[in-house]
From Swiss-Prot:
Species in which this protein is naturally found: Yersinia pseudotuberculosis serotype O:3 (strain YPIII)
A single BP term in Gene Ontology: peptidoglycan turnover
An example molecular function term from Gene Ontology annotations: zinc ion binding
PROSITE patterns recorded: ROK (PS01125)
Gene it is expressed from: nagK
Binding site for Zn(2+): H157, C177, C179, C184
Physiological role: Catalyzes the phosphorylation of N-acetyl-D-glucosamine (GlcNAc) derived from cell-wall degradation, yielding GlcNAc-6-P.
Residues annotated for ATP binding in this entry: 4-11, 133-140
EC number: 2.7.1.59
Entry-linked InterPro entries: ATPase_NBD (IPR043129), N-acetyl-D-glucosamine_kinase (IPR023505), ROK (IPR000600), ROK_cs (IPR049874)
SUPFAM superfamilies from the UniProt entry: Actin-like ATPase domain
Record's keyword terms, sorted: ATP-binding, Carbohydrate metabolism, Kinase, Metal-binding, Nucleotide-binding, Transferase, Zinc
Substrates-to-products reaction catalysed: N-acetyl-D-glucosamine + ATP = N-acetyl-D-glucosamine 6-phosphate + ADP + H(+)
The protein's name: N-acetyl-D-glucosamine kinase
Any matching Pfam family: ROK
Length: 304
């Protein structure tokens, strides 16, 4: 049995998956904001409850919104203050008497998609999240590529490419990013960036859902905006594809529901790739909000 925890700032969700990778049980509880011992107790209680339900001890994986392991074995997760700077992996492993694995929630999303029965046939899978920010994960032969600092999937913090400046104008503001730099692509091609870009060019603020509705109705500003956005997205993704050369790209996050992405990217990407490059398959994520739990559960499976 495989147990996956998706640990966020407001809730902890546990999903239990059987040997056929089907979810058979799940539970949600509030996340304790400041109390680390309480957090450990909740995770222990949920694990033991799952053991009782399954009649066996399952493997345990946890996805967190942050960096899973610093050099000193602690986690960096500002959205879960009770775990910030704590040796969560070591402490919980000791409490439940089995190895616990922890990874970034975006990596868990990518792992979940890569272990889809159909997608599993692709050796290299790029999971790309276009949500409030931009992130994701790289999966090679069913396992996460983490890198030395566990930041391999922090795609949103690449700077705007030169070709994007040709589209947006050289005077486009280099928007300050939460990482401390300016001009990171997540400020332009995320859901938030989609809205910011519309506001910048038209001095009018609209939510993404309204912009997309206006686009569908043929409103000229919205049409021009979507065309511009798709061009910038193709430039940025083209750089990623040239560096990583995946067989499959799976798109998640709020903007993944904008079906125009899957129609337009295959048309626009070739201009930004090497001439010898073949386009990867580009698909919408299949597991939605359950992807984090599913991927966390498969952190052990990926090592088999």
């Amino acid at each position: 049995m495989y147990y996956g925890f998706d640990m966020g700032g407001t809730k902890i969700e546990l999903g239990v998956f059987d040997e056929n990778l089907q979810r058979i049980w799940h539970k949600r509880v509030p996340t304790p904001c400041e109390d680390y011992p309480q957090l450990l107790q909740i995770l222990r209680d949920l694990t033991e409850e799952a053991d009782t339900y399954c009649g066996v001890q399952g493997s345990v994986g946890i996805g967190i919104p942050g960096l899973p392991n610093a050099d000193d074995g602690t986690v960096f997760t500002a959205n879960v203050p009770s775990a910030m700077g704590q040796p969560l992996q070591a402490d919980l492993s000791r409490l439940i008497q089995r190895e616990v694995r922890i990874d970034n929630d975006a990596n868990c999303f990518a792992l979940s998609e890569a272990w889809d029965p159909e997608f599993r046939t692709y050796p290299t899978v790029l999971g790309l999240i276009l949500g409030t920010g931009v992130g994701g994960g790289l999966i090679v032969n069913g396992s996460i590529v983490s890198g030395r600092n566990h930041i391999t999937g922090e795609f949103g913090h690449f700077r705007l490419p030169v070709d994007a400046l040709d589209i947006l104008g050289a005077d486009i503001p280099r928007v300050p990013c939460g990482c401390g730099h300016r001009g990171c692509i997540e400020n332009y091609i995320s859901g938030r960036g989609f809205e910011w870009m519309y506001s910048h060019f038209y001095q009018h603020t609209l939510p993404a859902t309204d912009i997309i509705a206006h686009y569908a109705a043929g409103e000229p500003k919205a049409v021009a905006h979507v065309e511009r956005f798709m061009d910038v997205l193709a430039v940025c993704l083209g750089n990623l594809l040239t560096m990583l050369d995946p067989h499959l790209v799976v798109v998640g996050g709020g903007l993944s529901n904008f079906e125009k992405i899957y129609q337009e990217l295959p048309k626009r990407l070739p201009a930004h790739l090497l001439r010898v490059a073949r386009l990867p398959r580009i698909e919408k994520a299949r597991y939605g909000d359950s992807g984090g739990v599913r991927g966390a559960a498969f952190l052990h499976l990926a090592e088999k």
